[in-house]
Amino acid sequence: MRIECLYEDEMMFVLNKPSGLLVHRGWDNAETVLVDYARALTPGGTAHPIQRLDRGASGPVLFAKSAGMARELSEWAQAGYCRKDYLALVRGECPERLDVDHPIRRRLDGPRVEARTLVRCIAIAHTEPRHASLVCARPLTGRLHQIRRHMKHANHPLIGDGRYGRGDLNRPFRERYGLARLALHACSWRVERPDSHAVVGGLVPLPEDLCEPLRRMGFDLDEDRLPHDLQRYLDPWEWPSDASA
């Protein structure tokens, strides 16, 4: 498997994770994880993931090149200077704007903690058996499965989500449109460097396993495999004062 490196400097680098690959090894002791690819790129094999990304999701993951840089970048991320925006396909006709401010549990048996996600609807497709909406989501907090859980709470669960979605809807989208994965992709990333405050980042095109099903549903994507005028949905959200990693 070839993993694309989206950015690299002396402090950090960003890898483009495909759907189906874990960021790091967990209880299931996966044979290969993204950290393995990351360590192969660095002298001495040291790479520290600063962000997580669900196994079924795709898109950029930030790594630090040393333990010291990892501590610095983690603190910087918690202060709100690392941002990702996501494209998601959700059930039903989503409102033009959603502000989901709903506490969620860190663990099944733990207390609820603050969680907030901003959502903007890009387009609606008249798919069968239910209409579907392509949305842009920006999590202002970094809780586990936050976008997936918040969209379920809003009654617009993600298509292809085996945990928080509905199998009776996921199945037709797989059979009719070829969508065989979680419909969640981090399409934009931005990091303000803690040393110089220079901003690095960029857009990340949809992978083919998500791009082609969306086109079959009738969504209009440009030659860069992103929705037309995507930047229009990203710009108005510039760095909310209460944003965190």
What is each model feature region?
Residues A30-L34, A38, A67, P129-V191, ...:
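Pseudouridine synthase
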Residues V90-G92, C121-A123, A137-P139, G160, ...:
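Short, structured patches in soluble enzyme cores that scaffold and shape functional sites
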Residues H126-H131, P194-A198:
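Short, solvent-exposed loop/turn segments that connect beta-strands within catalytic domains
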Residues M1-P129, P172, L203-A245:
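RNA pseudouridine synthases
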Residues K84, S133, L182, A198-V200:
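Glycine-rich GHKL/ HATPase_c ATP-binding element in histidine kinases
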Residues R106-L108, T141, V191-V199:
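Short acidic, glycine-rich loop/turn motifs
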